[in-house]
Each structure stands twice: as C-alpha cells, then as structure tokens.
C-alpha cells in the first residue's frame, strides 16, 4: 500500500479515521435494532441489550487490539528496517484490514468452538446462570418477582471475552506464519486506493467493517442468543410473550422452579447460521 516520506499515509488514529470509526459503531447498533424487530420470538429489550452488550464490549476490545497490533507491527518493521529504502512500507491499514477479515470470517467458527468448550466445561463444574442468552435465575426465591440477573450477564460476558481472546490468538498465529501472503492479499485488494489515503481509511475503517461486521454480528448473535428450540417455561421469560409463534410456545406442564439437570453438560450455543 501507498507510503511516502510525507504525511499522506494511512493513519488509523488520524481525525478522519476516528470519525469514521464512530460512525461505524452507530451504524452497527442501528443494524442490530432492525434485526431484533424481525425476530420470532423477540427478545425483551433488557435481554437483547445484554446479548448485544456482550458483542459490543467484545468488539471494542478486539477493535482496539487490532489497532494496537497494527500500529506496533508497523513500528517494529520500521525499527528493524535493513535498507534506506526499506521493504517494510506496508501501511498500518494492511495489518488492520487482514485482522478484520479473519476476525469476521475464519474467527467465527473458532469463536463458536471456544465458547462451546468453555461452557461445557463450566457446566460440568456446576456453574449456575451461564446458559447463553438466559439471564433469568434458575431458581425462584420466595415471592420476589423474577427479573434478569446482571450477575448472569457478567458471567456470560467473561466467557465471551475469554472465547474472543483465544480466537484472536489463533488469528494472530495464522497471520504471523503467513505474513508475506497476507500482505500480498491486502495489497491486491487495497493497492488501487493508495493515491487516496483518506479514502483508503474510509474503505478499511467503514465500508469493509460494515459489510463484514453485519455478517459477523448476525452469525455471532445466532450463536450467543437463546434459541427457540431450547425454550422451557423457566427461560421463556427472556422473550416478549406476544411474539411467540404457535410452535414455539413452551409446554406449561413443564413448570419447575429449577432448570432440569439434563442440561448441565449440554452447551446452549446455537449454530453459526
């Protein structure tokens, strides 16, 4: 990608890129709101907020991690340059784009596998309230009204962050061992925009992220949300009652104050699509 001795390079922390990143985040939230309106059954707003909160917090962490890796990678390559001309003039945008591409494609099945294994292990250790997408208590205490537990959200968020961390490590290894091929691929896709660095930032930080993130959010949301196939009377409270289809209404004869033990060793994570 284009690099000169001046300032016309792709800078991920420049004013244009920071503005575009903010706009990207706002657009992603709007897309997720639209997706919720077409759900059957539809999650309650507080439950949806918890599900999306896990993705947003995790995505912010991965986003800034990608920025940091991209910038440090560029500085390290510049520090160890051998010749005056250097063969390490790849922009920060190269590495960021490649991280983004793998995070939102190859990273999704890796994340699903990580979450599946983590939850299965924790359930075998009898951890409570870790069923993904179910934030209501597994037991009813007295006559107190049942409401989503923030502690359940925190537990599931920590599981999600650990899964993201493992996924990010796998993606980093893939890029690190296939670095030359990765940079060639980035230059093939982005090289034509070298003469317009601000436009290149717009592509890398907005256009591609919007397209890739929409795909990623859709897939990951399907993984972490509570699926209608797993509905029981104890977890149906996560959904708005007037949005159930006829074949999704849980059997009221299954009323119980405790989640059946048969689910203790079964992961609640759904399919990617």
From Swiss-Prot:
Note: Present with 1440 molecules/cell in log phase SD medium.
Organism from which the protein derives: Saccharomyces cerevisiae (strain ATCC 204508 / S288c) (Baker's yeast)
Vacuolar side: 1-13, 73-97, 178-198
Residue stretches spanning the membrane: 14-34, 52-72, 98-118, 157-177, 199-219
Coiled coil, from the record: none
UniProt topology in membrane: Multi-pass membrane protein
Protein's UniProt name: Vacuolar membrane protein YPL162C
Record's GO cellular component terms: fungal-type vacuole membrane; membrane
